[in-house]
From Swiss-Prot:
Known role: Growth factor for endothelial cells. VEGF-B167 binds heparin and neuropilin-1 whereas the binding to neuropilin-1 of VEGF-B186 is regulated by proteolysis. VEGF-B seems to be required for normal heart function in adult but is not required for proper development of the cardiovascular system either during development or for angiogenesis in adults.
PANTHER family according to UniProt: VASCULAR ENDOTHELIAL GROWTH FACTOR, VASCULAR ENDOTHELIAL GROWTH FACTOR B
Protein name: Vascular endothelial growth factor B
Listed Basic and acidic residues bias regions: 129-139
Family from the record: Belongs to the PDGF/VEGF growth factor family.
Single GO MF descriptor: identical protein binding
Subcellular location: Secreted
A single Gene Ontology CC term: membrane
Keyword check for Secreted: yes
Region Disordered, residue ranges: 129-178
Length: 207
């Protein structure tokens, strides 16, 4: 190949490389990145079945094996935004899909099947409010211990206990005075006086 032809080919390749080189967003003020239209953004974000990755360890619910291949799968589950914070995206239609999973339990391995739930229809519905009100505490009445041997104790509900009986405090100066019943109880009667006289005469005669 002649040197002139080689130069022409090199110039052509350089021009082709320049035209195919990616243009940076900072190369010119007129360059604009592609903007996703609002209608597409809204459509992608709405509540609908979408492909999500689910770890198989969560689906086994306690059935443990050494290793699962793959360790996670993709299924259609409900997800997306709702127009109100009080709503949530929930499934209204679901079905079961069976998948083959390689279960490795050394030194052997085998193909098994797992049944996974997929969502086919979704809808925004009101969130289930958890009961934030605590149950009322049961009022336990306070019972005073009942004495085992108290004369006249009534075990029926509502009866006054000995601790409930209020003993009035005597007024000042009343402690020296005795009630008439108390004075009568301390003064000897006629029969007691005659008995004392007889006992006195017997004692004198014996002396």
């Amino acid at each position: 190949m002649s040197p002139l032809l080689r130069r022409l080919l090199l110039v052509a390749l350089l021009q082709l490389a320049r035209t195919q080189a990616p243009v940076s967003q900072f190369d010119g003020p007129s360059h604009q990145k592609k903007v996703v239209p609002w209608i597409d953004v809204y459509a992608r974000a709405t509540c609908q079945p979408r492909e999500v990755v689910v770890p198989l360890s969560m689906e086994l619910m306690g059935n443990v094996v050494k290793q699962l291949v793959p360790s996670c799968v993709t299924v259609q589950r409900c997800g997306g935004c709702c127009p109100d914070d009080g709503l949530e995206c929930v499934p209204t239609g679901q079905h079961q899909v069976r998948m083959q999973i390689l279960m490795i339990q050394y030194p052997s391995s085998q193909l098994g099947e797992m049944s996974l739930e997929e969502h086919s229809q979704c809808e925004c519905r009101p969130k289930k409010k958890e009961s934030a009100v605590k149950p009322d505490r049961v009022a336990i009445p306070h019972h005073r211990p009942q004495p085992r041997s108290v004369p006249g104790w009534d075990s029926t509900p509502g009866a006054s206990s000995p601790a409930d009986i209020i003993h009035p405090t005597p007024a000042p100066g009343s402690s020296a005075r005795l009630a008439p019943s108390a004075v009568n109880a301390l003064t000897p009667g006629p029969a007691a006086a005659a008995a004392d006289a007889a006992a006195s005469s017997i004692a004198k005669g014996g002396a």
